[in-house]
Amino acid sequence: MTWETARRAIDLAATGKMPFTLQFSGGEPLLALPLLRQMADYVRSNRIPARMDLQTNGTLLTEETATFLRSARIGIGVSLDGRPAVHDALRCYPDGRGTAADVVAGIRQLAQCGMEIGLTTVVTADNVAELSGVVEMAYYLGNVRRVGFDLLRPQGRGSAVRRARAEDMAQAMEAVFALNRKLGRMIGHSMAITQMEQAACLAQRTGSGFSHCHAMNGAGVHVDALGNIYACSSFVGDAHFLLGNVERGIDVQRRKEVALEMQNAMAFCRTCADFSACGGACYARRAGQGPPAVSAAECALKRAAMKALLNVAVQCNKRTGQ
């Protein structure tokens, strides 16, 4: 991405004069560190009301980079798919070496700068049985404030990877929440689990709808390296989901049409008794993959989070005598 494209993307997002989130993702965004510096400086010097977040594979987190990220107040999410052996089997350098050691070293660089982070785990059939290891790693590292689990989306290289089964997902998340409670009692506070936080937010809402997805609500877009604007990062290169570009802006009517198309395709979610507490499944994860059954693992993930939240509420009520 050129600086001119990046600047136009920021300016376009800022036209509404309302706070927004600027998410740097990839590929690997730290490969474009000079551009990130320019963008962060531009946001700060122009007092643009943007929260900046970055999702990284963690292998390029040097002391210099960590210092910059802290000074720019950029929130950090690091991809970690399990304990080192599990992660190395899934994420390797071109020469076959695993990346786990460099990821852990990068996270420690952030810790030395006083930065807390979130961990994101992409769940597949190859690591679903080992998800509790991510929780162990989060406590071990010491500067992790949140762990999130993201089921594989079958686009691009992901189309060749085996997806986790619903029954395995349910069992894995039960183990995750149990271990989190156990370790939390030992040190005095539990790790935040993204799916449980989402369930807590949804439990407080008064309306209904596909609240989890910015694309389905017309509330977020993805800008690619060429400045093209898509409804979701999962559909980069697919002209059907092209909404405009940073020069011409967003086709508002097309954005509405795409959002409605996504909602209609996921209409089966509305018939579920858990819909209001779930927010619906991910359109991108299901698109082109057949019947609603392909969302079963996601349903299992969310139901496990709702169950864990209910258990917390029950325990709180017992302690307060309600």
Which residues make up each language-model segment?
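Radical SAM enzyme [4Fe-4S]-AdoMet core and its adjacent flexible, acidic
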Residues: 93-101, 108-212, 216
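Radical SAM/AdoMet-radical enzyme domain recognition
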Residues: 3-25, 32-152
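Short, solvent-exposed loop/turn segments at secondary-structure junctions
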Residues: 29, 59-60, 83, 124-125, ...
